Amino acid sequence: MMLRTCKDVTMRGERVVVRVDFNVPMRDGMVQDDTRVTAAVPTLRYIIEQGPRHVVLISHLGDPTRDADKAEGNAKKDGCPFDRHAFINGKHRLKPVADCLAKKLGVPVHFAPSCVGQREFIEGLPDGSVVLLENVRFHPEETSGDAKVQEQFARELAQYGDIFVNDAFGTAHREHASTVVLPRLMRRRVAGLLIEREVRYLEPMVCNPKVPMVAVVGGAKVSSKIAVLESLLRTSTALIIGGGMAYTFLKAQGVGVGTSLVEDDFIDTARMLLQKAQSGGVSVVLPVDHVCASTFCADAQPVAVDDVHIPMHLMGMDVGPRTLEQYRAHLKGVSSVLWNGPVGVFEFDAFAHGTRVLAQLIAEATDAGATSVVGGGDSIAAVSKFGLASRMSHVSTGGGASLKLFEGKVLPGISCLET
């Protein structure tokens, strides 16, 4: 898909609305990880340099009502007091993000205390001003399932501009007012530089990758990755399956997995996927040895198991050295690598070795000329933890959105933009 971007429209003197993804982790009113803020800077800097009348930024930050309800329920269960107002102020207000963005852009970022009713405030600012509106999800209309309610809310937002730029890849799979309805009400609707880059790297991986291609799919559950696996079986030369989901596949082959995480309801699904792979000539790489533990905790004693079968009293926590050698063999000389999900409990240092070596092998393949794409929150956290993000061709900013693309799905927040 060739998208029109912010570089394809004239912005001088225009009112520009940008949907960004500033859904960042917050603690006590402080930004804990500014990766998504940093990712938006190239697009915003480019737009500012074009001399627009103003730039209005729209974002969400968590889901205030749902998050507060959950936290309040947990507090009641534990018999603890709960201050709903303080909770929302500490985790869902975008003012700290405006301050963070101002430092990165090197220009003032004005903050509007609401996302509606701000036209007079915005138009009273000097030309070229940048304004961040308050959390769009403070208004339930944003996520309403009622099309008329969403459109009415989107019309409120449409008053702020003539050109819509979507640079919020992380929400592109959501059919929300600010991502899908709003752009249809604007004179021009184009992609930001971040979305353009995401589509440029991710779409070929699932539609027409350079071969040989190796897909690495990990994480805890088969149930959350069925559509991804089915999609990748159509394009991959080899499929490496690791993490907790690997034990469901091993059990489907009659392998003993001890007390490892298994989704018994999906064993037949795992068998079906293995049969599809065999019919399609796709090599499936499952663990042949393991690093195990008797309990699931950070200080558990690692136990090496040099066999595909796991003893009854142990659970798999990471892959072993023979499995890593198989990874090395399959990744040597590849043209494309897609990685979604860790192959072990990398959050625990004692069980991080497999995921660390995998990341290193993918980095080496990239150095040798392969195109590598990393998508999914845990994989992104892993390459960042091991200091290897800069050696990947592309590290996606979208968890759910990248997963939907890997499934071969159309993203509504992108399909509504100009091509």
Curated annotation (Swiss-Prot):
The lineage of its organism: Bacteria, Pseudomonadati, Spirochaetota, Spirochaetia, Spirochaetales. One of its GO terms (biological process) is glycolytic process. It comes from the Bacteria. Belongs to the phosphoglycerate kinase family. Pfam families: PGK. ATP binds at K225, G316, E347, G376, G377, D378, S379. Its EC number is 2.7.2.3. The gene is pgk. It catalyses: (2R)-3-phosphoglycerate + ATP = (2R)-3-phospho-glyceroyl phosphate + ADP. Pathway: Carbohydrate degradation; glycolysis; pyruvate from D-glyceraldehyde 3-phosphate: step 2/5. GO terms for molecular function: ADP binding; ATP binding; phosphoglycerate kinase activity. Keywords: ATP-binding, Cytoplasm, Glycolysis, Kinase, Nucleotide-binding, Transferase. Monomer. One of its GO terms (cellular component) is cytosol. Substrate binds at D21, F22, N23, R36, H60, L61, G62, D63, R137, R174. This is Phosphoglycerate kinase.
